[in-house]
Curated annotation (Swiss-Prot):
Family recorded in the similarity comment: Belongs to the AKAP95 family.
Region (Mediates transcriptional activation): 1-124
N6-acetyllysine modified-residue sites: K247
Motif Bipartite nuclear localization signal, residue range(s) on this chain: 238-260
Name by which UniProt lists this protein: DBIRD complex subunit ZNF326
Compositional bias annotation for Low complexity: 530-539
Record's note on what induces expression: Upon retinoic acid treatment.
Keyword Lipid biosynthesis among UniProt keywords: no
UniProt gene name: Znf326
Naturally occurring in which organism (per UniProt): Mus musculus
Segments for region (Disordered): 156-196, 256-302, 470-580
PANTHER family to which the protein is assigned, alphabetical: A-KINASE ANCHOR PROTEIN AKAP 8, DBIRD COMPLEX SUBUNIT ZNF326
Cross-link Glycyl lysine isopeptide (Lys-Gly) (interchain with G-Cter in SUMO2) mapped to chain: K140, K240, K247, K254, K264, K401, K459, K467
Primary localisation category: nucleus
Length: 580
């Protein structure tokens, strides 16, 4: 029996030496050449391999163990030993461990009680080998990184809770990441002991007496560094403190931001009323903008012909046609009335204002009809346009004029064939585009209505309309002079004031952050502007902005109409399409 024991002992010792490359005694009280006896809370006293094997195989009983005496001190069986990634005989605690004094003074025997099993399950101890091999040098960890009192101040987890509930007690902020001196905020990728963290650890309570046990790492006494503890605690609660003050005031922070550009505009434009130099510069700028608008219209006329301005449009419904009957039916249709009702609901305008807006569209249709009639009275101009359409086209180009159908919702041209139109009507793309386009029309109709009411010319007409007069009445002037005067008024409404447009676009971009709250505020402000116009009060800045907004809406309509006009080719309603 002695021979067999000696053989087993020598074989085991040789295997250990080959595995570690050096002669080590893996007794429960030793690690890396340092002899420890955790059972008695002191160093020294190298234990023999005989005593270790006898203890491991249950051949020798020690006091204080009970059922767990067959396992060595601090080597009670748990899920750690069944997982790979570490030495199965390596002690679970490394250098500089305070457990030898804390647990040695708190518990008796060899610490084989249920507390040992409970404590061993904490902090990712059973997460495999990743929690036993530190990938980073301990010297790089922030001082006090693993100190227990830093966790005591803001951890609400109990010391004997489930391992799935308690986070790994690493990192000063409880996020499972160490703070390295190389980076201000530390890395967010790895756990201090390798592998992922077991939890975020956002608790803010106090730990129990046993929940603040040490983990392997550098131990620093925080009693000499109270400032660090305060900083760590303040760091943990800083975000919640910020949210308390930011969230309630979030809606109020944007309003001053939106008001600042208006204040700047008022301050910059108020001197123009008294400074003649600024007035001259403003006039030159306006003339330059008008000239640019004329060049733009000439360019569109050269590209699409003059007929694109002959279309009948409804600015609110984005309806466009070349037939008088169609526009007449639209202005009396339920869809047009629904758009007006939506505008009234969003803007809170009274019935008189809505009637005035409807009359504006009717008057626009009448003026377009007069312009078109005058154009048709000069057939030579129409022939020139028709000739220019096919100019340069030869038989080798394989091009011809065909009739098409334009879908504004999908922005596509469809061949004027029954099968093609029906196929597009039943397509899912058209169904989705139709709903989206309808919502877009409703949103833009509100902006168009408020922009029109801000125009100074429209304000004057509204004042006459409220008094019971007809602001669109055609007087007994010669027809040519009346049309010229109306066109001048329309040009004033349509003239772009591009600098104001840019400022308005910036305000709109900022206003989108505020959402519907800002939109309602703008609408109410514009309603007040309309009422002020009825009383004869007009603000210079508001007039300039209104003119720019009205012109912008009209220009968008004209740009949209150019594509449709190109498809219909003036009165013939035809466009060019390539046939290969």
């Amino acid at each position: 029996m002695d021979f067999e024991d000696d053989y087993v002992h020598s074989t085991c010792r040789g295997a250990y030496q080959d595995f570690n490359g050096m002669d080590r005694d893996y007794g429960p009280g030793s690690y890396g050449g340092l002899d420890r006896d955790y059972g008695h809370g002191s160093y020294g006293g190298q234990r023999s391999m005989d005593s270790y094997l006898n203890q491991s195989y249950g051949m020798d009983n020690h006091s204080g163990g009970g059922g767990g005496s067959r396992f060595g001190p601090y080597e009670s069986y748990d899920s750690r030993s069944s997982l790979g990634g570490r030495d199965l005989y390596r002690s679970g605690y490394g250098f500089n461990e305070p457990e030898q004094t804390r647990f040695g003074g708190s518990y008796g025997g060899r610490f084989e009680s249920s507390y040992r099993n409970s404590l061993d399950s904490f902090g990712g101890r059973n997460q495999g080998g990743s929690s036993w091999e530190a990938p980073y040098s301990r010297s790089k960890l922030r001082p006090g990184f693993m100190e227990d009192r830093g966790r005591e101040n803001y951890s609400s987890y109990s010391s004997f809770s489930s391992p799935h509930m308690k986070p790994a007690p690493v990192g000063s902020r409880g996020r499972g990441t160490p703070a390295y001196p190389e980076s201000t905020f530390g890395s967010r990728s790895y756990d201090a002991f390798g592998g992922p963290s077991t939890g975020r650890g956002r608790g803010r309570g106090h730990m129990g007496d046993f929940g603040s046990f040490h983990r392997p790492g550098i131990i620093v006494d925080y009693q000499n560094k109270p400032a660090n503890v305060t900083i760590a605690t303040a760091r943990g609660i800083k975000r919640k403190m910020m949210q308390i003050f930011i969230k309630p005031g979030g809606a109020f922070i944007k309003k001053p931001k939106l008001a600042k550009p208006m204040d700047k505009m008022n301050l910059s434009k108020s001197p123009t009323k008294t400074d003649p130099k600024n007035e001259e510069e403003e006039k030159r700028r306006i003339e330059a903008r008008r000239e640019k608008q004329r060049r733009r219209r000439e360019k569109n006329s050269e590209k699409y012909g003059d007929g694109y301005r002959m279309a009948f449009t409804c600015s609110f419904c984005k309806f466009r046609t070349f037939e008088e009957k169609d526009i007449e039916l639209h202005l009396e249709s339920s869809s047009h009335q629904e758009t007006l009702d939506h505008i009234q609901k969003q803007t809170k305008f009274d019935k008189v204002v809505m009637e005035f807006l409807h009359e504006c569209m009717v008057n626009k249709f009448k003026k377009a009809s007069i312009r078109k009639q005058q154009t048709l009275n000069h057939p030579e101009a129409y022939k020139i346009i028709e000739k220019d359409i096919m100019e340069g086209v030869t038989a080798d180009d394989h091009m011809m004029k065909v009739e098409t159908v334009h879908c504004s919702a999908c922005s596509v041209y469809i061949p004027a064939l029954h099968s093609s139109v029906q196929l597009h009507l039943k397509s899912p793309d058209h169904s989705k585009g139709k709903q989206a386009y309808k919502e877009q029309i409703k949103r833009e109709s509100v902006l168009t209505a408020t922009s029109i009411l801000n125009n100074p010319i429209v304000k004057a007409r509204y004042e006459r309309f409220v008094k019971g007069e007809n602001p669109f009445e055609i007087q007994d002037h010669p027809q040519d002079q009346q049309i010229e005067g109306d066109e001048e008024d329309e040009e004033k409404i349509d003239e772009p004031i591009e600098e104001e447009e840019e400022e308005e676009e910036e305000e709109e971009e900022e206003g989108e952050e505020a959402g519907s709250v800002e939109e309602e505020g703008d609408v109410e402000g514009e309603e007040g502007t309309a009422e002020a116009a009825a009383a004869g009060e007009a603000d210079a800045v508001g007039e300039a902005e209104g003119a720019g907004e009205a012109e912008e809406a009209e220009e968008e309509e004209e740009e949209e109409g150019t594509q449709e006009f190109a498809a219909q080719a003036c009165a013939t309603e035809q466009c060019e399409h390539r046939q290969m």
